[in-house]
Each structure stands twice: as structure tokens, then as C-alpha cells.
Amino acid sequence: ADVQSLYEMGVTGSVSRSRITRLLPRGVRYQGVVHEQPASDLPRVLVPLVIRHDGYLPEQMSRKQGRNQRLLLQELSRNPRDAYINYQLGVDFELNRDFSKACAHYGVAMEQLEVSSGYEHDLCVRYLYCLGQAGRHEEGLALAQAQMPKWQDSPDFFFTLGGVLLDAAIAKLDGQVEHWLSMAQASWERCLEIGEVDACQHGGVAGRGSYLAAHNLAVMHEQLGNLDEAQALRLRHPMPASAS
């Protein structure tokens, strides 16, 4: 199914889309304590089913504060190197803005990840984002360099990389402010080149291949005094009413 999770990002809304198995044949059961997965080796088939999920909105998060984390930590005590449990713990810490702990669990998940895991793309993008938010720019850039060949068609990857590069410029990493700014610009331009992709390809956040990347580029051009280019970007990739 196409699961569309709703988030709040500052004053705007965001929709993350994921391909998740939620329509099960008779006899198949879920396993796991949180974010359960079907216990089956049967092939997955995409069906035209869209599920809207509001569990990550603030009012829902406040109701279940700490619940998922307690359950996941109990499971982690039994399987400390399990990639999926560490991934889900990373997500929980990230949503609660504890980026240092999120990075610790994402790092273990990356080390233990099995080939062709369905959440590999999301894990990579989230880990990259959290490294940037934790101020670990050099580690983030090293991760991006290692992972880039896999995600050449992912606007989410390049959108997030652009944010890390901008943070590196703000932090004056290695004294190369202009270098990091130009690379951030190139990353967001790459998002527009790729465009929006089908959620079934990797999953990801709507707008990172269009209006969100264009917004970041427009802000950058405005700061540089390139007002005509900024306006052109906003006109070519208008922000939808639902995200403004």
C-alpha cells in the first residue's frame, strides 16, 4: 500500500510516502512489538490502496510519548545488533529531536543492514539528516559520498545532502564557505533535475523533487540578490496550498 504519513515541518505541512505491506492474505500474521512487519516470504505486490497516517503529528506524538521507545528498548535488550530495531529506535529519537541518540542507532542499523532491505533508502536519508543536525558535518559528508552511487535517482537524498552542505557552510567547515554553498546549490538543482519520483521507487517526502528544493534555491538566490532567478523558481515550482 501507499502509506502517506503527515508531518509538521515548522509552519508548513509535509507528506512522507512509503510502500508498506498492509493488505495481507489469510494466514499471514505480523511480528514485532512496534512497527510490526508481516512474517512471510511471499512476494509483495503493489495494490492501488492509499492509507493516510497521522501518527507523527504533534497531538498524536504527545499521546504516545515514550511508549514506542520503551517497547523498542526492551526488544533491543534481546537483540542489540538487530538492524530494524535500531532503525526504528533511530526514528523515535529523531522525531523527539534527540539527534545524537538517533545517529547512534542509525549507525548500528547501517552496519547490520541486510542487502535489499526495504527501509535502506529511508535509513540512509534519515541518518544523513541527523548527522547534519547533530553538527557532525564531516561524518555526514563521508556518508553521502559513500552512499551517493546508490541514490542517483533520489531527490530525498540530494535534498538532505543540500541541507548538510548548507550547515557546513554556516559552520565554516575547513574555511570553505563558498565551496559548501555552491555544492548545496548543486544538490538542490539536482533534485529539480530528478523531479518527483514514484513512492514505490524509494518512498520519500513529497516536494523534494520540486517545490521544496525550489524554495531552498529561491531563498539562496534572494540572499545573493538574484531576485529575478528566485521569482522564476517560485513560479516554475509553486508551493501547494497544503504545504504553505
Language model regions located:
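TPR-repeat structural position
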Residues: 65, 99-100, 137, 171-174, ...
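Catalytic-site signature of metal-activated, phosphate-bearing donor transferases
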Residues: 1-104
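Start-of-helix register in tetratricopeptide repeats
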Residues: 84, 118-122, 155-156, 205-207, ...
